[in-house]
Design a protein with these regions (language model features):
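Substrate/ligand-engaging "lid" and interaction regions
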Residues: 1-302
Length: 302
């Protein structure tokens, strides 16, 4: 845990199997709760394995419910996983899943930068975390897990996180990249970048307050807390990690365009959100497939 008080935390009682091996199907089929943290684009790749596990539960006559939660950095990630899983189920499997498999969307918030360690299983995280799970998507007895908050109106929490943390984070990364600044903490320390990011988060926040009725003072405090997380020098979070996959981040439902359109829809200013989106369009990283594709599109189409 890399923060003001850095500490090592040993996680025990874990095991692993290769997700491409039959053993993975057995492990999933015997679970009552399955969570993912693989990245949105990977969900369709693991969906066939999950579907096979559901089919196996059906064949074995398992009537106890199983719940799926995709802890991904996207809106309704579990719904997207469900769609991919159902595409790989038989009609009987779909009917079984409708009755016995829950797919609960969630909002997950914790900065996890790449690990600079000799031990490949080490993970670096910040102290702060939030995990909000939509109750209505769960089947059977509600799980009681430390750190999990069960909520009714998940979309408010999803968009609060997306429009605040994710929006501010990626704008910091793209502006930092334009200035040749390597890490988020150093980028947000730049006075001009700090000003643009803060203003953009206030613009997205104004849209959230209009849409969901968040308390303005509490939301201002939430923004301040998020910016404090960006300043954490212990994470050494690269702007290339935070800015990766710019096409996804520029999509209509993601962290740049969605908050801009929400605020603009209420007639609110979006000047600094536009600057952030513009910085994303300038993201040119030859090691990032989406960045290369983005620059090719701009070169060909303007």
């Amino acid at each position: 845990v890399m923060d003001v008080d850095c500490k090592d935390q040993k996680i025990e009682n874990i095991s692993g199997v290769n997700s491409t091996k039959p053993e993975a199907i057995d492990e999933i089929a015997s679970a009552d709760l399955v969570t993912t943290a693989v990245g949105l684009v990977i969900l369709p790749r693991i969906a066939p394995t999950i579907a096979q596990a559901i089919e196996k539960r059906m064949e074995n006559g398992v009537k106890e419910p199983m719940n799926m939660i995709a802890c991904e950095n996207a809106i309704r990630g579990t719904s997207q996983l469900k769609k991919a899983v159902y595409e790989n189920l038989s009609d009987a499997g779909k009917a079984y899943a409708d009755e016995y498999v829950g797919f609960a969307d969630c909002a997950v918030d914790r900065i996890v930068p790449p690990v600079k360690s000799e031990n490949f299983i080490d993970v670096v995280v910040e102290e702060y975390f939030e995990w909000d799970v939509e109750k209505s998507g769960l089947k059977g007895e509600l799980p009681q897990i430390e750190g999990m908050t069960l909520v009714d109106d998940l979309m408010a929490y999803i968009e609060r996180k997306l429009f605040t943390l994710n929006t501010g984070h990626c704008i910091t990364a793209y502006l930092g990249n334009l200035r040749g600044i390597p890490t988020i903490d150093k980028a947000i320390a730049d006075e001009e970048i700090f000003g643009i990011v803060s203003a953009a988060m206030k613009e997205s926040g104004a849209g959230l307050i209009k849409k969901y009725g968040f308390d303005p003072e509490k939301h201002a405090a939430y923004i301040k807390k998020i910016i404090g997380r960006f300043k954490n020098p212990y994470l050494q979070d690269d702007v290339t990690r935070v800015g990766r996959e710019p096409l996804r981040k520029l999509s209509p439902t993601d962290r740049l365009i969605k908050p801009m359109m929400t605020a603009a829809g209420y007639g609110l200013p979006v000047d600094h959100l536009v600057i952030g989106a513009g910085a994303a369009l300038h993201y040119d990283n030859p090691n990032d497939k989406q960045s290369v594709e983005l620059q090719e599109k701009i070169g060909a189409q303007g």
